[in-house]
Swiss-Prot record:
Main localisation: cytoplasm
Catalytic activity line of the entry: isopentenyl diphosphate = dimethylallyl diphosphate
Amino-acid positions noted as binding Mg(2+) in the UniProt annotation, renumbered to this chain: 67, 87
Pathway: Isoprenoid biosynthesis; dimethylallyl diphosphate biosynthesis; dimethylallyl diphosphate from isopentenyl diphosphate: step 1/1
InterPro entries assigned: Idi_bact, IsopentenylPP_isomerase_typ1, NUDIX_hydrolase-like_dom_sf, NUDIX_hydrolase_dom
Family the entry assigns: Belongs to the IPP isomerase type 1 family.
The protein's name in its UniProt record: Isopentenyl-diphosphate Delta-isomerase
Amino acid sequence: MQTEHVILLNAQGVPTGTLEKYAAHTADTRLHLAFSSWLFNAKGQLLVTRRALSKKAWPGVWTNSVCGHPQLGESNEDAVIRRCRYELGVEITPPESIYPDFRYRATDPNGIVENEVCPVFAARTTSALQINDDEVMDYQWCDLADVLHGIDATPWAFSPWMVMQAANSEARKLLSAFAQHN
């Protein structure tokens, strides 16, 4: 895969430039554009993934299915499809917006900061998974209600962005409706 960049944003969310992805994520990460996706199978189960130990931020942490950064000239939806293919080797239905104005800042225990405008999407898988071990060390298909209960009971076991997304009542409602619509 070619070198990825992040699209830097000002406080109003307007693009101001780009920076190489790994150089962008530091203890003083600038606001940038990202996306987050929750993938479901035909049974309505959510794919929860565990980040590879080689990841710069939150290694080994359980999270929602796939996250990433759109590239210049790429729509968020196309970026979701690209990263699903790269990380999971999977084809998906067109991504649907779940939480378009999600924005967060969180600091990893090693000091790396995420500072993102991060629209959230849901999609269904349409092929078998072919996991990229450089990205994902483990995965599990789970009932959404069980995952949400786990997040509520043990938020420290999940990525902060997943916890914050699940805490939004409208996003939770839309994810539940998406999971039930087979």
